[in-house]
Amino acid sequence: AFNSGFNSIRRFNDAFQKKFARKPSLIRKLKKKSIADSVVLHLRYRPPYDWNAITEFFKSHAISRIECVENDCYHRFFLDHHNGKPAHLKVSNLPHENALKLEVFGADTRSLFWLSRKIRRMFDLESDPLLIANAFAQTPFLKKLYNKSPGLRIPCGWSPFESAIS
């Protein structure tokens, strides 16, 4: 619930029930196969968000045959956190929703929490531009830099090892 941007589990459950006309507990009880063909998550961020700068970062640091930026989307192949099998993810920007769309293909659904946290960290979605703007407003030099790129974030790699070699 908290990763989806809700302040409480009760609010999440209410929104879930309105959207899908059933309680989340009923969905959890369905126990279908744990490998999803594909799952889509919307990971919210606080605007502004400089998607072009983020994709340029990942494009310039991409590890060949593992990750790439194509058609304004970030793609990555990885070994699933739970079953060790190959999976694929795709991240695109939904600026009208202030969210990134995370599409996961072939992963065990138990890996979704881990993956969503990793993508939130990689794309710096926890950043608060208003807080940064207020802090930088105190120093004219920093204020000028911030105003040039107000949606700039600090992206990072998949792992510290990959960050070191890319």
Language model segments and positions:
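HhH-family (HhH-GPD) DNA N-glycosylase catalytic core used in base-excision repair
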Residues: 2-166
